[in-house]
Design a protein with these regions (language model features):
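Conserved ABC ATPase "signature" region
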Residues: 1-17
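Conserved ABC ATPase signature
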Residues: 21-25, 29
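Conserved catalytic motifs of ABC-family nucleotide-binding domains
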Residues: 42
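Catalytic Walker B motif of ABC-type/P-loop ATPase nucleotide-binding domains
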Residues: 46-50
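H-loop/switch region of ABC-family ATPase nucleotide-binding domains
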Residues: 82-83
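A short, surface-exposed alpha-helical micro-motif characterized by mixed small hydrophobic
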Residues: 88-90
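H-loop (His-switch) and adjacent beta-strand-loop-beta switch element
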Residues: 95-107
Length: 128
């Protein structure tokens, strides 16, 4: 059993957390452990709801880099919700803006600079 857990944690570079109690994990560490659970068994599509919530800035970058690596290594599609526009610009290859219904979709740059985004968030692309 321990070998299987280490294998799962290894997918998200978190083997060193195997003996840590869940309550003692940082936000980023907890997200890695939860992601390891979500990847067993390996899905075709990984759906994440605000995975950056509660994670510090350094942890966000590390988590997104790791998600990108997992996506490539395991040929996964990742669908995630986020309000972190900086991470969207850096990592997303397709963005869908939803406010009760699909308002627009495209590249992060296109969506974040679009009129629909400005209407929903009362912001413009230049301010992001």
């Amino acid at each position: 059993m321990r070998a299987k857990v280490l294998q799962c944690l290894g997918r998200v570079q978190a083997e060193g957390l195997i003996d840590k109690r869940m309550g003692n994990l940082s936000g980023g560490e907890l997200q890695r452990v939860l992601l390891a659970l979500a990847l067993e068994p390996l899905p075709n599509v990984l759906i994440l709801d605000e995975p950056l919530s509660g994670v510090d800035v350094e942890g966000m970058t590390a988590l997104m880099d790791m998600l990108d690596e997992v996506r490539v290594n395991y040929d996964l599609s990742i669908l995630m919700t986020t309000h972190n526009f900086d991470m969207l610009k850096r990592y997303a290859n397709q963005v869908v803006l939803i406010n009760h219904t699909v308002l627009c979709d495209g590249t992060a740059e296109d969506v974040l600079s679009g009129k629909e985004f400005a209407q929903v968030f009362h912001r413009t692309g230049e301010a992001i």
